[in-house]
Regions:
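Active-site nucleotide/adenylate-binding loops and adjacent lid/helix of ATP-dependent enzymes
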Residues: 1, 151-199
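Flexible hinge/switch segments at interdomain interfaces of large molecular machines
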Residues: 97, 147-148
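Low-complexity, highly charged intrinsically disordered N-terminal segments
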Residues: 69-79, 85, 97-138, 157
Length: 199
C-alpha cells in the first residue's frame, strides 16, 4: 500500500544504500517510527521542500520511538510529522487518505513562512559555505554563524550597520522575544483593554 501511495519513495535509499532501499526495509520488517520518518520526508519533498535527513531510534519501550527528520520550515516540519502519523495509521487500517490535501497545506505553509527571495539567497549561499543559520523571527531576521563570528541580517541589511538594532529597539515585542530567546529574564507584558482585565 505504501508503494502505491508514494511511488516516488523508490528514491529513498535508506540504510540499504540503493534505489528502493526503503521499500526493501519495509518488506523485511521495520519500525513504524521508521515508516513515519520516511513519510514525513516524502510529503515535504512532494510539497517542494527537499528534505532528506531522518533517523529513528528506539526508546526501549515497545512501539515508542524517537523520530528525527529535517525540514526547511519549522511549521511545515511539525505539520509533516502529524500528517505522517495520520497517513501511517490510514495505511495500517487500509483506509483511503487524501494525500493531496496534506501536500497542498504544506505548500501553503511554505509560502506563508519561507524567507523572501533576497534573504533566502543569502541563507542558501551561507549553507553552501558550511555556515549555520538560525531564524530569529517569523520574518526575515536571521543569524549566520555562532559566537564571535555570528552576523545578523534582516532581508539584505547586515548587522555591520546600526539599522537592525534600531529596528529591533523600536519594536518592544520583538525586543522582548529576542531577549527571552537568549534566556534573559524579561517581564511579561500584556495589553489590558477592560477594567476586568486589571484584576
Amino acid at each position: 500500500r505504501i508503494e502505491a501511495m508514494f511511488p516516488t519513495m523508490i528514491e529513498h535509499r535508506c540504510s540499504e544504500g540503493c534505489k528502493g532501499g526503503f521499500f526493501m526495509r519495509v518488506k523485511e520488517g521495520t519500525w513504524m517510527g521508521h515508516v513515519i520518518e520516511h513519510i514525513a520526508l516524502e510529503i515535504q519533498t512532494l510539497a517542494g521542500m527537499d528534505c532528506g535527513f531522518g533517523r529513528t531510534r528506539t526508546t526501549g519501550d515497545e512501539g515508542i520511538y524517537y523520530v528525527v527528520f529535517s525540514y526547511m520550515e519549522e511549521d511545515a516540519g511539525v505539520y509533516a510529522a502529524k500528517a505522517a502519523v495520520r497517513i501511517a495509521q490510514s495505511l495500517v487500517d487500509n483506509k483511503p487518505y487524501n494525500l493531496d490535501e496534506d501536500i497542498q497545506n504544506l505548500r501553503e505553509i511554505r509560502e506563508d513562512t519561507r524567507l523572501g527571495p533576497s534573504t533566502g539567497c543569502i541563507v542558501d549561499e551561507a549553507l553552501k559555505r558550511g555556515i549555520p543559520f538560525i531564524r530569529l523571527n517569523k520574518q526575515s531576521l536571521v543569524q549566520l554563524g555562532y559566537g564571535i563570528h555570528q552576523k545578523r541580517i534582516r532581508a539584505t541589511i547586515a548587522s555591520t550597520t546600526g539599522n537592525i538594532a534600531v529596528d529591533i529597539a523600536c519594536d518592544k515585542e520583538e525586543t522582548k522575544a529576542l531577549l527571552e530567546m537568549s534566556e534573559i529574564p524579561v517581564p511579561r507584558g500584556t495589553v489590558i483593554r477592560t477594567e476586568e482585565g486589571l484584576k
